[in-house]
Amino acid sequence: MARSLKKNPFVANHLLGKIEKLNMREEKEIIVTWSRASTIIPTMIGHTIAIHNGKEHLPIYITDRMVGHKLGEFAPTLTFRGHARNDNRSRR
């Protein structure tokens, strides 16, 4: 179910503060976060945010097409290694 339009999009306070500080100083540096539930807002465009995937932080460059999506959508947590092989030779 989509979030109500009466509410603002969720962005973690610590993440929003870091982005605002970097925008005021006009600096670009990698921002490390565990907040996968935060929504990407227009002030984040042009920054690189390292999003935690459960094991490591994946650096993601934020573009204008990502606005409105969640950070977690761009850092996959599962790696598919293929289905189990049906190896008939090893059964004999």
Curated annotation (Swiss-Prot):
One of its GO terms (molecular function) is structural constituent of ribosome. PROSITE patterns: RIBOSOMAL_S19. Coiled coil: none annotated. Gene3D superfamilies: 30s Ribosomal Protein S19, Chain A. Its main location: plastid. It is found in: Plastid, Chloroplast. It holds the Pfam family Ribosomal_S19. One of its GO terms (biological process) is ribosomal small subunit assembly. InterPro entries: Ribosomal_uS19, Ribosomal_uS19_bac-type, Ribosomal_uS19_CS, Ribosomal_uS19_SF. Disulfide bonds: none annotated. GO terms for cellular component: chloroplast; mitochondrial small ribosomal subunit. Keywords: Chloroplast, Plastid, Ribonucleoprotein, Ribosomal protein, RNA-binding, rRNA-binding. Belongs to the universal ribosomal protein uS19 family. Protein S19 forms a complex with S13 that binds strongly to the 16S ribosomal RNA. This is Small ribosomal subunit protein uS19c.
